A protein has these predicted regions:
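Active-site microenvironment for binding and transforming phosphate-containing groups
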Residues: 2-321
């Protein structure tokens, strides 16, 4: 059971195919666990990171879990107020099994954060860290899974192929303005001796520029930080779209086509994070990004914006075997 997703390598505008994988790699493990049965979950993997033999990584999607508050059999991995905690824990266990984050039948510890849209990054040196507050986490410990939760914000995974170190980052617009992924590369250089040319990045599913309408305060914030900010914002004309869909609402108004066009300001948050990675010294060829939009595909992804805040969470997971 597989489909395909598009990962973009910005160099030369190449488009790479990334498999949507059912939990076949550890199907036997799932069958042995009485509380778990394979449910058709689908995981996204970067084709670039997949070539690293000692790496475990995945971006989860919406279908194929045990939670039910946001649809039948969904893979919500966030502890929201609507889904049962036990069901979310079963989903997380299923993801660890499916990605191979298990050694001799024992699941790896999963490190997550209480995310606060910050630039706080933690270096994990223990398999049982204290409760962490922030939006980035890095480690060089093997058999430890790092997880970032998202539902429109971009998850970014960093992997140093030489030093065997990994990082996971939550990049919403606020964290992006604070340069969280650029700082993540810096932390890996300081803590592990990483070189930017040895680091590979995968930007996971998030809200693409087609859907990310923002206000002037967001534009102003980016302009205070980045000299290329103009290249990240786009004016989108939305003229008469509602009239065309609901013509009866405008029986006594001006005919379609005669009103002033509605200009909306949209932000390319994915590109903003890609530019930060380049600014940190990473080669363009080492950066891949998922092209799919979480807002445009609510059946495939949880989306805070599309579902007006009442939704689950995806997880971006990375670890060292």
């Amino acid at each position: 059971m597989s489909g395909s997703a598009l990962f973009i390598c910005p160099q030369g505008n190449n488009v790479l195919s990334a498999d949507l994988e059912w939990c076949v790699p550890t199907l036997a493990n799932a069958r042995r666990a009485k509380s778990l049965k394979p449910t058709g979950l689908k995981l996204l993997r970067s084709p670039d990171l997949t070539r690293i033999p000692w790496l475990v990584h995945a971006f989860t999607t919406r279908p194929g879990g045990f939670t039910t508050s946001y649809g039948r059999r969904t893979l919500n991995v966030g502890f929201t107020k609507d889904d049962l905690r036990a069901s979310v824990e079963r989903n997380r266990k299923q993801v660890l099994l499916a990605t191979g984050a298990v050694t001799r039948g024992t699941q790896w510890p999963l490190v997550t954060l209480r995310q606060v849209h910050s630039d706080i990054i933690h270096v994990v040196r223990s398999r049982k860290p204290d409760k962490l507050v922030g939006d980035g986490v890095v480690t060089d410990l093997p058999r430890l899974a790092l997880g970032i939760l998202t539902a429109d914000c971009f998850p970014v995974l960093l992997v140093d192929t030489k030093k065997k170190a990994v990082g996971a980052f939550h990049a919403g617009w606020r964290g992006t303005v604070k340069r969280i992924v650029e700082k993540g590369v810096g932390i890996m250089r300081l803590e592990f001796g990483s070189r930017p040319e040895d680091i590979h990045a995968a930007i996971g599913p998030g809200i693409q520029k087609c859907s990310f309408e923002v206000g002037e305060e967001v534009e102003d914030a980016f302009h205070t930080q980045f000299d290329y900010a103009d290249e990240l914002f786009h004016n989108v004309q939305e003229s008469d779209a509602v009239r065309e869909r609901y013509p009866m609402l405008f029986m006594n108004q001006r005919a379609p086509g005669h009103g002033d066009p509605c200009i909306k300001l949209h932000l390319d948050l994915r590109e903003a994070n890609r530019r930060q990675l380049l600014a940190a010294g990473m080669p363009e060829a080492n950066i891949t990004a998922l092209a799919d939009c979480t807002v445009c595909q609510p059946r495939r992804f949880f989306s805070h914006r599309a579902e007006r805040g009442k939704t689950g969470r995806q997880m971006a997971l990375v670890g060292i075997q």
